[in-house]
Amino acid sequence: RAQAWSHGAMNRLDQLATLLRFPSISAQKEHARDVSDCADWLVDKLSGMGFEAVAHKTHRHPVVVGRSPREEGRPTVLIYGHYDVQPVDPVELWESDPFEPEVRDGKIYARGATDNKGQLLAHILGVEELQRQNGGHLPVNVIFLLEGEEEVGSGSLSLFLKEHRDELACDVIVVSDTGMAAPDTPTFSYGLRGLAGAEIIVKGPSADLHSGVFG
């Protein structure tokens, strides 16, 4: 049993290494094909788990949607994540190739290892393990929503959600893009800071006014 566990762990690490090797930099046009190839890998992975998986084209980078076989009467959990990564410049400051994973001091170093490919794959592999333990079934219906533009502002996501609202209907959303309080402390993050903008318009006189008279 220990040998089987060890083999399974190595297989999962190999899958993570494969995912990390895609230079899926959404901000750079020259990596558009790499982003698309990464999306295709995720589709293949989810399809191999029995999910109905599609890489939907957008005006920029694909949105991957994977759905488990639906079982009536069970709630639906949507797991959101992103497979795009930040640029690597200045590359000369890296101790190793950012797209060739390297283990140092028990840690995996590669672009995207903790934002967000590690978390994303952890959820996928967790669902796969649940399937294995339950004869291919899941206690809930699962939808994976994996985008390729999070690092550039998710420009295609809003329209995609509007166009696929019914298809993505769910009871609970889990965001697969957070960290842990400590390496040995599993963590549920239930809130993050968002973005807010404001435009302030100030109107006043066209000439200086005496504060003692007009103030």
Over which residues does each language-model region extend?
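Acidic-enriched catalytic cores of C-N bond-cleaving enzymes acting on peptides and small amides
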Residues: A181, Y190, G197, S211-G215
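N-terminal helical capping/dimerization or prosegment-like subdomains
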Residues: A2-V91
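Active-site metal-coordination/substrate-binding segment of hydrolases
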Residues: R74-L146
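Acidic/histidine-rich catalytic neighborhood of metal-dependent amide-processing enzymes
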Residues: N116-G191
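Flexible glycine/proline-rich, aromatic-decorated loop/lid segments
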Residues: T187-K203
